[in-house]
Every structure is written in structure tokens, then in C-alpha cells.
Regions:
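Short, positively charged and aromatic/hydrophobic N-terminal segments
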Residues: 3, 7-16
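Peripheral (often C-terminal) accessory segments that flank ATP-dependent C-N-forming ligase machineries
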Residues: 323-329, 334, 363-402
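N-terminal-proximal low-complexity accessory segments that begin disordered
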Residues: 18-56
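ATP-dependent carboxylate/phosphate-activation module, predominantly the ATP-grasp catalytic core
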Residues: 235-290, 325-326, 330, 345-368
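Phosphate-binding site of ATP-dependent enzymes
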Residues: 173, 202-256, 305, 309-324, ...
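Flexible, glycine/charged-enriched surface loops at secondary-structure junctions
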Residues: 296-306, 368-375
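Glycine-rich phosphate-binding loop of ATP-grasp-fold ATP-dependent ligases
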Residues: 156, 175-205, 232, 254-272
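Conserved N-proximal alpha/beta basic substrate-recognition cap immediately N-terminal to
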Residues: 44-57, 65-167
């Protein structure tokens, strides 16, 4: 008995349809750099459970790739019944069958990597619709922490010898050592000079460094800052231009993403004012555009983000920019600094999702939402499945998001 393929509601308009894909294992796939890569179970389950979320930013008539159509429809209805009529959910077997007779306009994944290209080739996506291997290699290069260290960061060194790693840790006292490519806190190690004096677990760490250098070519080493607040700026490359899309106020637990504030851009700027001025944020934003636009204009189209940090600024924190007051003066009254680039995410981010979700809720909700009510967007795991949830409330000083 053959597979039954229902007629798609938008089949007559496939020439203008886009295929949307949520592939959150992207960062791990970049590290592996293989045509066929199998993500860990947690990554595969996250992709399956939240496969519906491109519906939040998709355009009318777009296809969204999912494992289970009924499951996706049930999940997305919690964010508005209109989403089920806006997009068409489609499984891999259905897509493979469809591509025998129809053409898509374009493909828009969470992030582009060699593994995803191989997956789409096997489904029958024409080569002309996919990035070349040369372009993917360049995207991978710009996605690396080595590239960020060279182009957007201060006080971050790319190191290819374990002895130099030890020198920098002794210089900084406390440091963060990172693999060039990793995901959700994996490939990130915190170490202090005290570990050398007490022996501690340093031999294990040294083996980890040697392994990263062997497999990925090197590691980055940077000072460990005393974090006050995580935040990010979200952008999109469109027609060769880097466009600012908004602030992302997010939180992490054990270096893994846990949630985002859902509110207007004006409210987010207001929340940040006790920590950093709007003018200084604008200056940082412009510097990022000036660096990223020429780097990406010929190789990448789509969303990207830059993670940042507000920290306490001590005398030794020479690489942390002083936070300026509202008049743009460095009076050193706050004792705060800003690290304007912790990571570059050359893909869609949960910050983009939060911006899109807020816009959708405002456009399709009651007057209460439109009067600047703040909510929190969370990704939660209940022991069985991952869930995207909206919870009422706003961050506080004691608990920014949790």
C-alpha cells in the first residue's frame, strides 16, 4: 500500500512558496561539518517537538517541514488558530513526492550547514536552490569563534597550542575557553589560575583543550567577566544590507538558553537604561553592521544575532567597554561595563523568535496585549517533550527571567 499524500491547499501557488525548516542542531552540525550528521537525541527531539515554530514568521502559503502534521497543528493553535490557515505543514515523504512535479521558490532553514544541504538533496531539492559547498564553508568560517575574535571582539585570542592557553589563564586569573564551534554551552570551559596550584581537574581540562585543537584547529581564550545581564542584538541580511531587527533580553541556565522577554522594542530599551544608554546601544549596533555587512553580503541572506553582556567592570577588565551615562560620559559611577560581542550566531535565534512571536501576538490579540503587557517566552522540557510556552510576568533584578 502506497503512502497517501493529501492535496496541498496552496499547490497552485508553489512557484512563490518558501520552505521553512527548524533545525536547532545547526551549531553541532557546523562543528561536525559532515554531509551526513546525526544529532544527539535531545537535538533531534527538540527539532521534532518545535518543528512548527517557523509558522510564527512564515508568510502566507509557505510550507513548514514537520515530522507529524496533526501534532504540529495542535501545537501551533496555542499561538493562534489563524496560523494553521496561513501555512501548510508538510512531512519529508510528502515533500519528496511533491518535488517530483512542483518547484519551490526558496528554502529558509534555521541555519545553513553541510548536513542540512545533504538532507535536502536526498529529498530532491534541486542543486540550484541550495548554497554551494564553497559558500557553506565561508558561512562556517564566519560562524566560528575564531572569526569573531579577529573581527568583533577585544581581549579574545585564538590559540593553537596548549601552553599558550595556560599562559592566558594565568594572565587573566579566571578565563573562559571555547571550541570554535559548539552549541548551548557545550564546548565551553571555565577555568582559573587556582586550578594550576591545586592541581584540581586541570589534567582533564588540558586533555579537552588538546582534543579541541586536534579536531577543530584551536580554541579561543577570554577573560571571565562578572555577568550582570545577558542580551543580544538581532539582525537580518537582506539584499546585501544588514538590517537591525531588535533587542533580545534573554536568560541562560548552566549556559543553555532558557527564555526571552516578550515586549516592544521601546520597552526593552527602557529596561536596559539603568544598565546602558540608548546612545551607546546605537553605537554598538552600528559597529556590528559595519563589520558584518561586507562580510556577509556575497554569501548569506537571512537572520543573524550577536550575543552581548553587561558586567561589573574592575580595574583589570581592560577589554570590557565602560558603560556611558545618558549624556555619553564615562564617569565610572555605575561600575558597569559592556562586552559588545560574546558570540556571533549566523542563523535565526530565539531572540528572533521572541520578536516575531510578540509581533504576532500584538497583531492578533486583545487590547490588553497591545497596552505593553510583558510576558516571558520559554522553552521547557517536561521529561517527555519540549514546549514553547508564554508565561505572564516581567524580569526583576533578582531574577531577570527566572
Amino acid at each position: 500500500m502506497g503512502i497517501f499524500f493529501p492535496i496541498l491547499r496552496f499547490s497552485l501557488y508553489l512557484c512563490t512558496m518558501k520552505l521553512r525548516i527548524f533545525n536547532p542542531e545547526h551549531d553541532l552540525a557546523l562543528a561536525a561539518n559532515l554531509k551526513q550528521f546525526t544529532a544527539p537525541h535531545a537535538g533531534r527531539q527538540l527539532r521534532s517537538d518545535l518543528a512548527f515554530i517557523p509558522a510564527l514568521w512564515a508568510e502566507e502559503g509557505d510550507l513548514v517541514l514537520v515530522d507529524d502534521i496533526d501534532f504540529a497543528k495542535n501545537r501551533v493553535r496555542h499561538f493562534g488558530a489563524e496560523l494553521n490557515s496561513k501555512v501548510e505543514f508538510i512531512t519529508k515523504p510528502q515533500l519528496k513526492h511533491l518535488l517530483k512535479t512542483e518547484f519551490l521558490d526558496s528554502v529558509h532553514p534555521w541555519g545553513w550547514n553541510l548536513s542540512l544541504k545533504g538532507e535536502l538533496e536526498r529529498l530532491g531539492i534541486p542543486e540550484i536552490m541550495l548554497p554551494t559547498d564553497a559558500v557553506l564553508n565561508k558561512v562556517r568560517e564566519v560562524s566560528s569563534r575564531q572569526w569573531a575574535a579577529l573581527h568583533l571582539q577585544r581581549g579574545v585570542e585564538y590559540v593553537t597550542e596548549t601552553a599558550r592557553v595556560k599562559e592566558l589563564i594565568l594572565q587573566y586569573g579566571k578565563a573562559v575557553v571555547k571550541a570554535p564551534w559548539s552549541s548551548s554551552g557545550r564546548g565551553v570551559k571555565y577555568v582559573s589560575a587556582e586550578d594550576f596550584r591545586t592541581a584540581g581537574d586541570y589534567p582533564t581540562f588540558e586533555r579537552w583543550v588538546a582534543n579541541m585543537i586536534y579536531h577543530q584547529g584551536g580554541v579561543t581564550v577570554e577573560p571571565l567577566y562578572n555577568k550582570v545581564r545577558d542580551f543580544a542584538m538581532e539582525f537580518e541580511m537582506k539584499d546585501g544590507k544588514a538590517l537591525y531587527r531588535g533587542l533580545s533580553l534573554f536568560d541562560t541556565i548552566k549556559n543553555a538558553y532558557s527564555g526571552n522577554v516578550l515586549c516592544s522594542e521601546a520597552e526593552k530599551v527602557e529596561m536596559m537604561k539603568p544598565l546602558i544608554s540608548e546612545a551607546q546601544l546605537a553605537g554598538i549596533r552600528q559597529r556590528i553592521i559595519e563589520v558584518m555587512e561586507p562580510a556577509l553580503k556575497d554569501i548569506y541572506s537571512g537572520p543573524f544575532g550577536v550575543d552581548m553582556m553587561i558586567c561589573t567592570k574592575g580595574e583589570k577588565d581592560e577589554f570590557c567597554e565602560a558603560v556611558l551615562n545618558q549624556e555619553g560620559e564615562d564617569v565610572n559611577r555605575t561600575g558597569l561595563g559592556v562586552v559588545p560581542c560574546i558570540e556571533i550566531n549566523l542563523r535565526r535565534t530565539m531572540g528572533h523568535v521572541a520578536i516575531n512571536l510578540y509581533e504576532h501576538l500584538v497583531a492578533n490579540s486583545s487590547d490588553e496585549m497591545k497596552t505593553n503587557r510583558t510576558n516571558i517566552m520559554r522553552v521547557e522540557y517536561d521529561g517527555n517533550r519540549y514546549h514553547l510556552r508564554i508565561k505572564p510576568g516581567r524580569p526583576s533584578e533578582e531574577a531577570p527571567l527566572h
